[in-house]
């Protein structure tokens, strides 16, 4: 839900499908493409997220969440897990570790044998790695391993086409390889410039940068830089 306009369309579709107004919003993390549609919904709508997501919205996205929009900030938060029932459907919301940010949640839909991953899964796209909001290249593979302990077959990623458990495993392999490159660079004192030239990142075959109207800069050099920055603790940028 990047913009209220898109939130309006989602609200319309949900109403058409159910003959009722939506009663709940789930924000998987704080980034604008997953939260800025909230104000399109009615004040008083349940808005669920992790505690960390609410903290990030209040600290890192303050300009947007003013006036009427503030009424659609998350109003039900939790630290690790929350089970909710909507009609006959059970939905499990779970924070299982750091990855994209430190507040990501996954949405398990047992009746549909499905999981929505939020941005813990970019299917065949280079991911945004928000170290500033507690994201972690190093922890991401283990977080995905915890997700794979649950029972599901259908996987809805935060970005990219619907996939399956093998799609998560492929992305997990990519993140593990990226983490190892960063760790080795830190141990060997490899510069950022040299790290960006590595030919060791091979699990990204077929990956594409995400773009909307303009490029977001989420590409191979970006993820290598983020891995190097986390591993070395050096956040100086190349010009």
Write out the residue ranges for each language-model feature.
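Conserved acidic residues
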Residues: 23, 75, 153
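Non-catalytic beta-strand/loop surface segments
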Residues: 76, 80-82, 87
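Metallo-beta-lactamase
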Residues: 2-4, 83, 90, 94-177, ...
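Divalent metal-coordination and catalytic microenvironments
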Residues: 14, 29, 41, 47, ...
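Extracytoplasmic/secreted cell-surface and envelope-processing proteins
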Residues: 33-36, 56-58, 125-126, 164-167
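Accessory terminal helices/loops
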Residues: 149-151, 162-239
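Acidic/polar short surface loop at catalytic or gating sites that assists cofactor/ion binding
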Residues: 48-75
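Active-site metal-binding motif and surrounding structural segment of the metallo-beta-lactamase
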Residues: 4-48
